[in-house]
Amino acid sequence: MALQPVTRRSVPEEVFEQIATDVLTGEMPPGEALPSERRLAELLGVSRPAVREALKRLSAAGLVEVRQGDVTTVRDFRRHAGLDLLPRLLFRNGELDISVVRSILEARLRNFPKVAELAAERNEPELAELLQDSLRALDTEEDPIVWQRHTLDFWDHVVDSAGSIVDRLMYNAFRAAYEPTLAALTTTMTAAAKRPSDYRKLADAICSGDPTGAKKAAQDLLELANTSLMAVLVSQASRQ
């Protein structure tokens, strides 16, 4: 029996989770009015301050709109939420949502080659040593999950070297969403994505100051990884 640590949530967090889940699954569609604060407290068996705190969090996450003295309504999270919502969207009822994985991988393919190009243009001397450390880890690591974390570290260095705060913040959101999926994708990654030579080719292009070569190497690496990953995920889903 695989036991997991027990997580003790606060009451406001429990309220937040219940309402957020209903919003994200469509159980509560955009525009629907929530019960009053008093009624929510009665239905959930909690205090009004706990409900109030949960509603503040839901509002900050772009899931509801709270109007003082008026009803609280569900917002369309696709229009109002931020990238920090991605980790919640990846898993629905404990299952990996393939459509969200596909969106993340497509966004990675569109953005990361440009980041590699920028890093090669800047060609910061300290980047070479950092990437070599990552490459050594990729060459020797046996554990597939840890290996994938090393690839994320590799891209961490590339993103920092590109010098774009927007790309940096987008990468933070990507990593926060992607990293929790590593255990679920271990089998796929072992077979399809463990290609340290592709990362070495990319590192060589960046460190030699070759923007065109770096962009192409990143494009090739990510296209292959995306194609292999999605093929296995779709195959697994069809068997369920």
From Swiss-Prot:
GO molecular function: DNA binding; DNA-binding transcription factor activity
Chain residues forming the annotated DNA-binding region: 37-56
Its biological purpose: Negatively regulates the expression of its operon as well as expression of end (endonuclease 4).
Protein name from the UniProt record: HTH-type transcriptional regulator Mce2R
CDD domains to which the protein is assigned, alphabetical: WHTH_GntR
Encoding gene, per UniProt annotation: mce2R
Biological processes per GO annotation: negative regulation of DNA-templated transcription
Top-level taxon: Bacteria
InterPro entries: GntR_C, TF_FadR/GntR_C, Tscrpt_reg_HTH_GntR, WH-like_DNA-bd_sf, WH_DNA-bd_sf
UniProt domain HTH gntR-type: residue ranges: 9-77
Note: Was identified as a high-confidence drug target. Part of an operon comprising at least mce2R and yrbE2A and probably extending to at least mce2A.
Pfam families to which the protein is assigned, alphabetical: FCD, GntR
Protein keywords: DNA-binding, Repressor, Transcription, Transcription regulation
Induction data: Expressed in mid-log phase cells and in gamma-interferon stimulated, mouse macrophage-like cell line J774.
